């Protein structure tokens, strides 16, 4: 029934899992689940990309999300090098200059990365809606 599960424990490689099939049964084939495991890394916190799937599966078993005998039907790795915003002390004034320039050229920003905000899914949808309204009125 949960769709976002956080794992602060250091024993798990992932820190957040998104279970799409708990949002809608249409997001996975009948009788199966769909899960995204979010893993952060940096030059200071390295991961072994060759063994990442094996580690994730083992950690999902450890977290009692899957059973050792469960069949994994598909796997995919998406590496987002710049997935998290890391602001500096003056980032708001810098971003305002960029946004002002873009909007003066009728370029509109929408979403988590474009707006430099930490958005959940509902916030991202509302951001897109606001941007669409802005574009429609311009």
Predicted stretch roles:
Residues 102, 107-136:
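A conserved FAD-binding loop/helix module that cradles the flavin
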Residues 1-108:
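C-terminal segments that line or cap access tunnels to active or ligand-binding sites in enzymes
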